């Protein structure tokens, strides 16, 4: 799957259109549950390209710590591309959380994905602090409440794995 028509429609939301393939649909004629996670990942990659690389900044290395998916309604084969809105909803010391809404051809939200991503030092595979430049980019696509809490919020990566 490749991205197309990547746009940042406002200061708080990054919007991307991702084409869906025939093979993304299951035998029940619905977008397969794994395909939702794949298109969300592609949208996060487009987010990184558009928000970091386009500004001449390196794309931060991140590991996904947690993904939470809520399915509301099926996406049917009459949808040839999904629209995904990505917003940063929490920023900690070493991690940040994105909230993504996946919409069908009618603009109806069919699924949401919350993803905790941890900034890592690739040489050690260890968490590292989010840099000042990364924080600057992340707060540009963050909920306004997140911007005020960015330097004082508890780090989602430091919570127990049971949450």
List the predicted regions and their residue ranges:
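Terminal targeting signals and extreme-terminal segments of soluble enzymes
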Residues: 1-83, 89-163
């Amino acid at each position: 799957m490749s991205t197309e028509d990547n746009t940042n429609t406002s200061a708080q939301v990054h919007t991307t259109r991702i084409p869906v393939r025939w093979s993304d649909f299951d035998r029940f004629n619905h977008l397969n549950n794994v395909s939702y996670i794949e298109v969300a990942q592609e949208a996060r990659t487009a987010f990184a390209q558009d928000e970091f690389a386009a500004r001449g900044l390196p794309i931060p290395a991140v590991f996904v710590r947690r993904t939470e998916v809520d399915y509301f309604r099926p996406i049917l084969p009459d949808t040839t591309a999904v629209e995904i809105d990505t917003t940063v909803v929490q920023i900690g010391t070493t991690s940040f959380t994105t909230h993504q809404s996946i919409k069908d051809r009618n603009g109806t939200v069919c699924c949401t994905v919350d993803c905790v991503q941890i900034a890592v030092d690739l040489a050690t595979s260890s968490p590292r602090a989010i840099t000042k430049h990364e924080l600057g980019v992340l707060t540009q696509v963050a909920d306004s409440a997140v911007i005020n809490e960015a330097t004082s919020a508890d780090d989602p990566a430091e919570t127990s794995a049971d949450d």
